[in-house]
Amino acid sequence: QSGNGIMVTASHNPATYNGFKIILQHQVISGETLQQLIPMMRDENLHLDKPPESMGSLVEADIVSQYLDHIVDISRLEKSFKLVVDGANSVPGPIATQLFDRLGCLAFPLYCDIDGSFPNHPPNPADEKNLVDLQRHVIDQQAELGLAFDGDGDRVVVISGRGRIVWPDQLMMIFAR
């Protein structure tokens, strides 16, 4: 395991945007600390005091299977169900579909082919117009629910089996019960 990483993401923003999340020693770098890094990142003449090969190592790893194994190990579904996953042509779509399949559910993928131009709709589930296709597919597939993710999976909106939007604040009320 590593306590460090960088995720290139624009989250729920349009394709013209990009950014990243930095994790150092298991802590997300944000706020003032992140602001202090920006001038260094913009500095084309940035020189390191040490040669790059002496500063550590870079390891590229496919962490998806390990992540899915972990989630499956700690999950306890009482019953399987049918759902539609709208991935908005972003990374969470195929991962969520694999996860629910592994949990014994029947997951129908919708826009789960990764394409950063977002040809079907922007990866913003907070915008109702981006949920119309998912609502229709949930009803057509007679699914129990639908999930709409943003570009990096830190936002989700649920669609009920009747095609009704269940907003995140409503989900919190359900979870509080």
Where are these regions (language model features)?
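Gly/Ser/Thr-rich loops at beta-strand to alpha-helix junctions
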Residues: N13-P14, N89-G93, G153-D154
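Short, ordered loop/turn segments at secondary-structure junctions
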Residues: A10-N13, Q27, L34, C112-D113, ...
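Gly/Ser/Thr-enriched, mixed-charge loops and adjacent short helices
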Residues: N18-Q141
